[in-house]
């Protein structure tokens, strides 16, 4: 099944049910417009063969996040989160140079960040999500502690240079994720998010032991 942050488009005849009270009519409008939902973390309440999905509404609609459950059989298309280069043309013009600089720095380290949150939803919908205080939410897929350190250094330097704030997660080799700011701290345990739950794990357990050459 699709994991957290994946984008899902439903078939016209898909079976789904709003979890947020009173959200059914707005969700019907949303899907009728051909817009996607995002896969949320399972909480054990969903029926077999279903996914928990979310639809975050724009600030003009109160930034409410609408929750629903949908049958997997009703999925027409499922993709990874948008890439930073796909999001960039839809961002406010004032921040596009900073995003271009971040993309160039990431590529120099063979990193290819994906985007979720307000910048992604503005690109996906054409609606206004991004405002002056919006964070840039990034998902970095990494394989080693060295790559994690490279991401931390890159993002912290970028924030200082451009006066913008980046939030987001490091996606670990086992497909779990940890908030990059929390990883950058000194705590011996960090909160790790999977597709089913959240749990505290020792920092040393985040990367599998690599065999000696």
Curated annotation (Swiss-Prot):
GO MF terms held by the record: nucleotidyltransferase activity
A Pfam family that the UniProt record links to this protein: MdcG_N
Coiled-coil features, chain-numbered ranges: none
Enzyme Commission number, as recorded: 2.7.7.66
Catalytic function, reaction form: apo-[malonate decarboxylase ACP] + 2'-(5''-triphospho-alpha-D-ribosyl)-3'-dephospho-CoA = holo-[malonate decarboxylase ACP] + diphosphate
Keywords for this protein: Nucleotidyltransferase, Transferase
Active-site residues, as the UniProt record annotates them: 135, 137
Major enzyme class: transferase
Record-linked HAMAP family: Malonate_MdcG
Family from the record: Belongs to the MdcG family.
Protein's job: Transfers 2'-(5-triphosphoribosyl)-3'-dephosphocoenzyme-A to the apo-[acyl-carrier-protein] of the malonate decarboxylase to yield holo-[acyl-carrier-protein].
Protein name: Phosphoribosyl-dephospho-CoA transferase
Recorded name of the encoding gene: mdcG
